[in-house]
């Protein structure tokens, strides 16, 4: 994802249901990181949101340089440095009461560890889909 910005104020989006339907038609399981496919399917069943992008996150270290791997980080004394590639999920949220409650719940997730968990907008997503947020 590109430029993260502070969360924007939701706006009315009369095309939400059509966009949600179009998105579900275009969703390809092969493009979703295997460990989170079922979670993404469940989220997309909610009537007030749909996912735009997601990434499970990937560990890179000496001996594992595949930036698309889904392998868990092994327990090993030989690994001295790990690069963790960002994990995120981006949603489009409907401008209704359920959507607003969902958005408020997402914002609260950052209280788990606000140093590493962020709630934001991604400018590149908002430009093509209003009411898009990432965590």
What residue spans do the PLM features occupy?
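Structured alpha/beta or helical-core interaction and ligand-binding surfaces enriched in interleaved
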Residues: 1-135
């Amino acid at each position: 994802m590109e430029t993260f910005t502070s969360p924007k104020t939701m706006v009315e989006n009369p095309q939400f249901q059509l966009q949600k339907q179009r998105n579900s038609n275009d969703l390809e399981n092969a493009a979703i990181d295997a460990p989170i496919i079922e979670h993404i399917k469940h989220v997309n069943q909610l009537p007030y949101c749909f996912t735009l992008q997601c990434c499970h996150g990937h560990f890179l270290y000496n001996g594992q340089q595949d930036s698309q791997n889904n392998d868990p980080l092994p327990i090993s004394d030989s690994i001295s440095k790990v690069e963790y590639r960002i994990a995120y999920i981006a949603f489009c949220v409907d401008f209704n009461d359920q959507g607003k409650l969902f958005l408020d719940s997402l914002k609260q997730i950052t209280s788990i560890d606000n140093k590493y968990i962020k709630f934001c907008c991604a400018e590149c997503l908002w430009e093509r889909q209003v009411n898009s947020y990432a965590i």
